[in-house]
Amino acid sequence: MSFVILVVLGLIAGTVGSLIGLGGGIVIVPSLMFLSTVTQLFQDVTPQVAIGTSLLVIIFTGLSSTLAYIKYKTVDYKSGLIFFIGSGPGSMIGAYVSKLFNSNSFSVWFGIFMILISLSLMLKAKARPINKAHKGIIRTFQDDAGEPYTYSYQASVGIAIAFVVGFLGGLFGIGGGSLMVPAMMLLFLFPPKVAVATSMFIIFLSSMTGSVSHMISGHVNWLYALALVPGAWFGGKLGAAINRKMQTKTIVMIMRIVLILIGCQLIYEGIFS
C-alpha cells in the first residue's frame, strides 16, 4: 500500500514540478511529513529524511524534464551552467544547515516558505519584466518554432541569486525553481518557457550536490525514493508536455491557493502542536 501511495505522490510531484518549474519537492516534502502524522507506514519520516529523500527524487524529475525540454529546444545550457556555479555550493550549505531543524521548527519555517512561494508565483503572473538595455552576457535564443528571443544578465548577479535559490533548495528539499523562474523572467527577460526549462536543468544539477550532502548524513530513505522515482520520472515528462501545449494560469492559481492553505496549516501545527 505504501508503495502505491509513493508512486502516485511521485507522479503528482513530477508533473506539477515540471509544469511550472518548481521541481516537485514542494509536493513531496509536506506530503511525507503529513503521512508521517496520519499513518504508521511512514512513522520514521523526520524533516531531514523528507528533505534528503525529496532532493534525491528531484534529480530524476529534473533529468526527465530536462530531456523532454531538450526535445523542444527550450533549455539554455550556458546560462544554466553559469547559474549552477552559485546554486551548487548553495544547495550543499543548505543541506548542512537543515540538520538544525526539529519537527516543529521545520513546520513553521517550511509553512512560511510555502506562503512566500505562493507570493512568488503571483509575482510571476502579475509583474512585467524590467525594461533595461542588454548588457553583460547577452543571449539570443530560438525555439523549435523558430521564434527568436534576446535577453541578458550580469553573471555575478545571476550567480548570487542562484546561490540563494540553491541554499533554500538544499534547506527545504524543494529544488528552488519557484524562486529562480520569476527572477529569470523579470530581471533577465528570459522567455517564460525557456525560464521554466532552464530552471529544471539547474534543479537537476543542484539537486545532485544537495542530495549528496544528505546521503552522507544518512538523511535518505532509499525505499521511499525507489517508489517515488518512477512516478516522478514519468511526471516530469508529462509536465513538460502539458507545459508545451496549454496555458498554465489556472493550474498556477490553484497551486497558489493550495500552497497558502498548506503553509498556514504547517505554521499552526508547528506553533501549537
UniProtKB/Swiss-Prot annotation:
Domain of life where this protein originates: Bacteria
Pfam families: TauE
Residues passing through the membrane, by range: 3-23, 50-70, 81-101, 105-125, 157-177, 185-205, 222-242, 251-271
Keywords: Cell membrane, Membrane, Transmembrane, Transmembrane helix, Transport
Record flagged with keyword Membrane: yes
Annotated InterPro entries: TM_pro_TauE-like, TSUP/Inactive_protease-like
GO cellular component terms, A-Z: plasma membrane
Membrane topology according to the record: Multi-pass membrane protein
Keyword Transmembrane annotated: yes
Location(s), subcellular: Cell membrane
Principal location: membrane
Family: Belongs to the 4-toluene sulfonate uptake permease (TSUP) (TC 2.A.102) family.
Protein's name in the database: Probable membrane transporter protein YunE
Upper classification of the organism: Bacteria, Bacillati, Bacillota, Bacilli, Bacillales
